[in-house]
Structure formats: structure tokens, C-alpha cells
Amino acid sequence: CALPICPHVSVVMNFTKPTAEKPALLTLGEVETFLHEFGHSLHGMFANTRFESLSGTNVWWDFVELPSQFMENYAVEKDFLRTFAFHYETGEPLPDNLIERIVKSRNFMTAYACLRQVSFGLLDMAYYTKKDAFTEDIIPFEKEAWKKAMIFPQLPDTCMTVQFSHIMAGGYAAGYYSYKWAEVLDADAFSVFKKNGIFDQATAQSFRDNILSKGGTEHPMTLYKRFRGQEPTIDALLERNEIKRNVESK
């Protein structure tokens, strides 16, 4: 049949229930979760491909979280919050200084958190790029893999590998880096919206046409560069996380 098939997409959430005194009020975390899942749903709703197996979220593993994490950026954008974030009794909008404090608190120790995720990705790749059978002591192997990203000394008699279920039984073998890579992509993509306006229709249409509608029909970097005009850099992520780059090592 040549007729297009419209997708059926649902977002199923577990929100805080109302009480006798208060209606159901969303926490910031619930708003972020909704936006995240809504990003996945947009990927499916805007799909325009011939084959279902290449539509929507059926993309490369390290590209699937771009639309979802991209949408999370709106959760702390003042212009977005002004469209709905009002006190349920007084109608008072969410104060700007409160939003700023939330952002500041989220960025506490963010550089350490970043390197922690990078270290996990390095360990993952160290295991899955090893050509010979593993016959070594695990702890020295971990330290060698982590030496580029380790800030604090490892506690004696601790071992990450034995609890690293993501790469052993969770489907992230040789793919744990995709968590941090998705952050690089979503921050870089959202920087275009920050520049042009977070509700700019032309920018949104380009994101839809070049990324959301294409699914897995082309290489992710081809799609991304078509939208962005260049490959992603880490600059937007560092700026969002308020991490100062060492100019000498740039």
C-alpha cells in the first residue's frame, strides 16, 4: 500500500498523585522526565521513512538519546517555564532567581561527574578493544584504563568491573560512552535554539526535517551536520555545565 501509515505514540508517566489538600503538582524531575519521553515520542511521530525498521528511534545506539535529552533542556528555560509554571493557588510565576539557583545547584561538582562518566566509558572500551583473552588482575587493569580521567585515588579493595552490569549484562557493551556523547550532541544542538530563540520555527523545522523525520535512514553524523552545519563540539556542554576550559590545553 502506498498510503502513509500514521504512528500511534503514547507517553505513559508515573506522576505524583493529588491529595485531599493539593492537586497533582509536578516536580522539576517529573517535568524533565516528561520532556525526555516526549522527545522520544516526537522521534516516532515525525518519522517519514519507507521502512518501519528505520523509523523513529530505530537509529544508531549512540544517536537515539539526542531527541529526548535535547528536550530536557527546556526544563530550565525561563521563556518555556513562563508558559505554564505558575503557583497553583496564587498564579504567581516561577521566580527567575529560583530557576538560576536550580541551575547552579545542578552544576555543583559537574566536572567531577563528567570525568566519572568518561572513566566508565574508558573502562568499557578497554575491555572490548582487548584482542587477547583476559587473564590479568582486574584492579591494575582498571587503574590503567582510568588514568586519564581519575581525580581521586581509588579506595583499596574496591573494584568497579564486578558491578558494572551495564557493559556485562545491560546492553551497553562497547557503548557506555553513548551517555556522555548524547550530552555533547543535545547541548550542541540546543545551542542553535539558544542562539536563534528556543521557539524559533525555522530552527525547529530544520531539526524536524533533518533529524527527527529521518530515523536511521542515513548515518547520524550526516544528519547532524545537515542540521547543524558542522560537527558537534564540547563547547556547548561545557558552557551549560559552567565548566571553564583550560585554554592552554585546548
List the predicted regions and their residue ranges.
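Cation-handling catalytic/transport regions enriched in His/Asp/Glu
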Residues: 2-250
